[in-house]
Amino acid sequence: MKLNELKPAEGSRKVRNRVGRGDSSGNGKTAGRGQKGQKARSKTRLGFEGGQMPLYRRIPKRGFTNINRKEFAVVNLSALNVFDDGAEVTPAALVEAGIVKNEKAGIKILGNGELSKKLTVKAAKFSKSAAEAIEAAGGKTEVI
């Protein structure tokens, strides 16, 4: 066997059949779809169930979006251990430390994890357990 005698495996290089490109090709005009009817047309729209009432219309609408909702950026106690002992933790300091991407409507401190440092924390909201843990560690909480 020589390099110039190499041939692809039988059936591995099948030419794609281009339909709807003239009658003489054997697959022109109706392009192998037969005559009229649903199967001769293009696809049905998304969510179409053959004329039966589709699922998205059978299920009732629920709820609404409250335009006055304030979304807080949440920070757990365990994340505050990156600050030095006696430091003042402000929203700007949290953004600078990379703990929070953006402040949104403010920052809420949650009580998940342990706090091992004495910190003065300034935030929009505190959970009860977070406030207790900060004060138990000798720190202070301040609502801004």
UniProtKB/Swiss-Prot annotation:
<comment type="function">
    <text>Binds to the 23S rRNA.</text>
</comment>
<comment type="subunit">
    <text>Part of the 50S ribosomal subunit.</text>
</comment>
<feature type="compositionally biased region" description="Gly residues">
    <location>
        <begin position="23"/>
        <end position="35"/>
    </location>
</feature>
<dbReference type="GO" id="GO:0003735">
    <property type="term" value="F:structural constituent of ribosome"/>
</dbReference>
<keyword id="KW-0689">Ribosomal protein</keyword>
<dbReference type="InterPro" id="IPR036227">
    <property type="entry name" value="Ribosomal_uL15/eL18_sf"/>
</dbReference>
<keyword id="KW-0694">RNA-binding</keyword>
<dbReference type="InterPro" id="IPR021131">
    <property type="entry name" value="Ribosomal_uL15/eL18"/>
</dbReference>
<dbReference type="Pfam" id="PF00828">
    <property type="entry name" value="Ribosomal_L27A"/>
</dbReference>
<dbReference type="GO" id="GO:0022625">
    <property type="term" value="C:cytosolic large ribosomal subunit"/>
</dbReference>
<keyword id="KW-0687">Ribonucleoprotein</keyword>
<keyword id="KW-0699">rRNA-binding</keyword>
<dbReference type="InterPro" id="IPR005749">
    <property type="entry name" value="Ribosomal_uL15_bac-type"/>
</dbReference>
<dbReference type="InterPro" id="IPR030878">
    <property type="entry name" value="Ribosomal_uL15"/>
</dbReference>
<feature type="region of interest" description="Disordered">
    <location>
        <begin position="1"/>
        <end position="47"/>
    </location>
</feature>
<feature type="compositionally biased region" description="Basic and acidic residues">
    <location>
        <begin position="1"/>
        <end position="13"/>
    </location>
</feature>
<protein>
    <recommendedName>
        <fullName>Large ribosomal subunit protein uL15</fullName>
    </recommendedName>
</protein>
<dbReference type="GO" id="GO:0019843">
    <property type="term" value="F:rRNA binding"/>
</dbReference>
<dbReference type="GO" id="GO:0006412">
    <property type="term" value="P:translation"/>
</dbReference>
<dbReference type="InterPro" id="IPR001196">
    <property type="entry name" value="Ribosomal_uL15_CS"/>
</dbReference>
<comment type="similarity">
    <text>Belongs to the universal ribosomal protein uL15 family.</text>
</comment>
